[in-house]
Amino acid sequence: FCLSRGLGDVYKRQIFSNANTILIPDPVYPVYLDTNIMCGRKIVYMDGKPENNFLPMPDDSVKADIVYLCSPNNPTGAVYTKEQLEAWVAYALKNDAVILYDAAYEAFVDDPAIPRSIFVVEDAKKCAIELCSLSKTAGFTGTRCGYTVVPHALVRKTESGKAMELNKMWLRRQTTKFNGVPYIIQRGAEAVSY
């Protein structure tokens, strides 16, 4: 768990290779797409359409390194069930992919059967990073305050083949490139209750 400026820190993806293949839902929150285009990564679109309730599911014919999921989705509002998230976790584990799970709108989920976190799925800690923003939860829009959960169990190989916890890489990135959320915003975030 790491306090951050919100989702933008991960979208810059300084802990992933520019050679990665990215799986992105369509329609999509523009930042997912644009930051990867700026890095020169290969983009593969997942077709969200009325027939699949705007919830694309894994396609075993596509090998991705990073998968973007947002639930509730921006811009459609569609939500994944636990069973659907289990299918995505199975896909990620099979393909050694990392799921970037955007939970910015999780506070709007009021059905206890709908997961508010990908970590309700067994083994998600081995393949997922969860991002959340207080912008939606507490009306903190524009304050750049959120958090990122990078489990210690999430291990991937570096370009040289060395196994590394992404948590350690993320912490190194944060301590090098992030000076912290301003104190007054931290105090406001502390006042948020669920």
Predicted features and spans:
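A short helix->loop->beta-strand "cap" motif at the edges of active sites that frequently abuts
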Residues: 20, 41, 94-98, 125-126
